[in-house]
Amino acid sequence: MKLKSFIGVVVAAMLSFVMVSCATNEAKFELGDNSPVVPLGVTKGETTHYLTDYYPQWVGADKVTSSDERLTLTNLAEDWSEFAITTDADAFVSSVEVWHDGKALSIVVLGGKRDTEGSYMSSVGVEGGVVKVEATQPVKEAVAVWQNNIIEDVVVEGNSIAVAIPVIAKDYARSVVRIFAASEGGRFNDILLPLEYGNVVTEAKDIRRQDHQSQVLYSLMIDRFNNGNSANDWKINSPEVLDKVDYQGGDLAGITAKIKDGFFADLGITTIWISPITQNPYDAWGQNVNPDTKFSGYHGYWPIYSTVVDKRFGTEEELREMLSTAHNDNMNVILDYVANHLHINSPVLQEHPDWTTELILPDGRENIALWDEQRLTTWFDKHIPTLDLERNEVCEPMTDSALHWVKNFDFDGYRHDACKHIPLNYWRMLTHKMKSAMPERNMWQIGETYGSVELIGSYVKSGMIDSQFDFNLYHTSRDVIVDANRSMRDIAAVVEESEAAYGSHHTMGNITGNHDKPRFISLAGGDMPLWGIDDKAEGWHREVVVGDMDKGHAGLQLLKAIIATVPGVPCIYQGDEYGVPGANDPDNRDMMSFDGYNDYQMKEYAQTQAMMKYRRASMPLMYGDIRTLYVDDAAWVFLRHYMGEWVLVGMNVRDTAKSLRVELPSFAQCGALEVAVATEGASASCLGGGNIEVVLPPYGYAVISK
């Protein structure tokens, strides 16, 4: 059924709901922080849930209810702060209502797993305040929410869904409608539609910097980025410390200078992630062998004082200037914060030496770098003891220290270090304090966890952390691009796995690399082997280069095409925008260069600029659903679609060109095509009947729009 005729059938049925929703449900809308909360996942049997994981401001509730007979709710605490849901159903969508003082907000309930084989739905249009969605299979049931309020009248007809936008949405500068549905075969992808005063946002110019799905991150290490104030330069200047691991002079003023000269804006960056700024020691610690050297705390990860700006990076006034300059340039700044440990000479540990976990295990071993065996207690090194954050008397003051930076400075959120090693109660307490103290601040938190999607996802809740870096996507992409024995199917599979685990509109960080990994371009170019070497030692004993320049730069460009076009938030590590080579830490932390690029690097920079700017200008890439149209060992072609607009992406990881024919879904008609961003030699053309031919050069990609 065409959009107009379908809308005509349902508008009359919905009109009464649209007109009276303000009068009947307004009390619900005023309850607490109504920022959209993540869905609640259940499986057959009983699952336990914590209220603050969804509504972090609420310590408890009067009751939690559901009108769905498939769900049995059990109160596990007097105040419903902990409750259980029991169900025998599978692959369904529903909701529960959380009540407080006679008012309620909802949590969407998703049963079973997402069907990534054939259950897709897409937003195809809006008319008269009614959104139409088309699915690939008959829809069994659907749930739609505005913020966290159930939209009562949702019309389902065959493969179509119609959802009315509540009139009250017109009173809000930014709100969202989310749509969830299931077929007999499984759950569909979910749909998220940002609204501007009640109207669906269809143009990127109306997206705001606080809209998290629109972010493009840039990760920088302050000391190694730009020196803007030589008056605060300082080195240990000891024969015990090689210059490579001593302070180099980068500071907050240097970041401000690069914001002002347009460096970040020219790259399409919307959010700057800065390394830790807390006071670190003035002496040297740790010990490297061959070559022998100790280390300074130039990186910022050895906090002495958790609430003091390290004067080698600048002053509080310079920090405020940097933040205001970024905001005036329509950019966010998030702070890298270290909660897992303190330096052994921290006054806090001098006063409370018992606040750490045990260094010696019962079997006599030292509890150092036992990342998985002793995940929540292991120390990183002897001079940075891990805090016992499972104890309330430790967790309370340490979350207060973290809160200091967003209460007293206008940061837009955090990048949290070593999340994997910090217990869940810390994240619940910190986010509760943040939401309670500053409910009007739309802050974003992203964490660092290596592990399974289950472990990573256990932290991704509205009452804990918004997202994490998707290291599984990075490692899979790295291996497929570098190793010809790996398959492009592996990348497609991990993208589907992430969508199923974190949601279709997750804001997981998709990285080009980071300060703890060898430079990707040296892996892709072959100068750094993937396996069988000490990737840190390589940087001490030789000059690590790209290797095969053509292959190295093509591989890095392909990686950036992946992270910018799949769901999630792309993140550029400093230097990767132009392709600086290097081994692992500390060779991947050389001082940043802003000029003097060779021809390859200039081309690399231009590709990064074009890709990230296009991503920020494309509603389908920021908010669209994703479906695979073709995949084999060498190539992957997928579609991103949003409100009738689509982008086709093709990628080829082999050294021979690929010519592929793909068929578009019925609602994504072919027309005049534009190759928006692509490797030289890529092309696309309409063949009729909804078919497109895509030509991809060796190690090439193409981003195509209509």
Task: List the model feature ranges, each with a label.
Residues H341, S401-L403, K407-I511, A561-T565, ...:
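Active-site-proximal helices and loops of the catalytic beta/alpha 8
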Residues V9-V18:
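Bacterial N-terminal signal peptides
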Residues V494-K536:
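Aromatic-lined glycan-binding groove of carbohydrate-active enzymes
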Residues D211, Q215, F225-F409, M429-M438, ...:
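Substrate-binding/active-site clefts of carbohydrate-active enzymes
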Residues N232-G250, A524-G547:
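A solvent-exposed, charged loop/short amphipathic helix patch at secondary-structure junctions
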Residues M1-V10:
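Bacterial N-terminal signal peptides that target proteins for export
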Residues S21-V37, D79, E97, S106, ...:
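Carbohydrate-interacting/catalytic domains
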Residues V216-Y218, I272-I274, V333-L335, Y414, ...:
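Hydrophobic faces of well-ordered beta-strands that scaffold small-molecule active sites
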